[in-house]
């Protein structure tokens, strides 16, 4: 049993991947709450509840915005660690999502907003559906990656 830099990378990635899974689960719950808020016709006809709805939507979008940079940074750290460790297959599996994160970050709205998840645009049904599908896809990717990292960590520890 040998402790190598690759084994360390897989251990750290395993812990951080669990954090990313929780981030994405929180995003799915937040988008579901926005969808419920969007479709509730009783609250839309109540003017006293309208201000509360708007504040709730702004609060959720603000929290979603705060998770974007940490998620992208953690995934970028994965790629950097695997590149330094010479784990080319694992790096190759992570590059497509890294490129998507870079594309999504640099193609944010041109109105000068911080990143994305603007309350007005997120309440558009098409954008809300897109964001929710994106979160489900990321959850699948991170879950599969978690088990791949677990297997690779064990393999790296017992292979020498």
UniProtKB/Swiss-Prot annotation:
- What this protein is called in its record is Protein cornichon homolog 2
The species this protein was found in = Danio rerio
Q: Which family, according to the similarity comment?
A: Belongs to the cornichon family.
Family annotation (PROSITE patterns)? CORNICHON
A Gene Ontology CC term for this entry? membrane
Among the GO molecular function terms of this UniProt record, one is: signaling receptor binding
User: What does the UniProt record say this protein does?
Assistant: Regulates the trafficking and gating properties of AMPA-selective glutamate receptors (AMPARs).
Keywords tagged on the record: Membrane, Transmembrane, Transmembrane helix
User: Where is this gene product found?
Assistant: Membrane
Per UniProt, what is the membrane topology? Multi-pass membrane protein
Give the chief site where it resides.
membrane
Task: Kindly list the residue ranges recorded as spanning the membrane.
Answer: 11-31, 73-93, 139-159
- The answer to whether keyword Cell membrane applies is no
InterPro entries in the record, alphabetically? Cornichon, Cornichon_conserved
């Amino acid at each position: 049993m040998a402790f190598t830099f690759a084994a360390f990378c897989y251990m750290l990635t395993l812990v951080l991947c669990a954090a990313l899974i929780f981030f994405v689960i929180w995003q799915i719950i937040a988008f579901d709450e926005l969808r419920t808020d969007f479709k509730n016709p009783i609250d839309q006809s109540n003017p006293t509840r309208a201000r509360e709805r708007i504040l709730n939507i702004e609060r959720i979008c603000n929290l979603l915005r705060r998770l974007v940079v940490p998620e992208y940074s953690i995934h970028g750290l994965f790629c950097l660690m695997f590149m330094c460790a010479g784990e080319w297959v694992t790096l190759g599996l992570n590059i497509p999502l890294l490129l998507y994160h870079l594309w999504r970050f640099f193609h944010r709205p041109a109105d000068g907003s911080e990143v994305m998840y603007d309350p007005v645009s997120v309440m558009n049904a098409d954008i809300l559906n897109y964001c929710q599908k994106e979160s489900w896809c990321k959850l699948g990717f991170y879950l599969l990656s978690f088990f791949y990292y677990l297997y690779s960590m064990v393999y790296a520890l017992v292979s020498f």
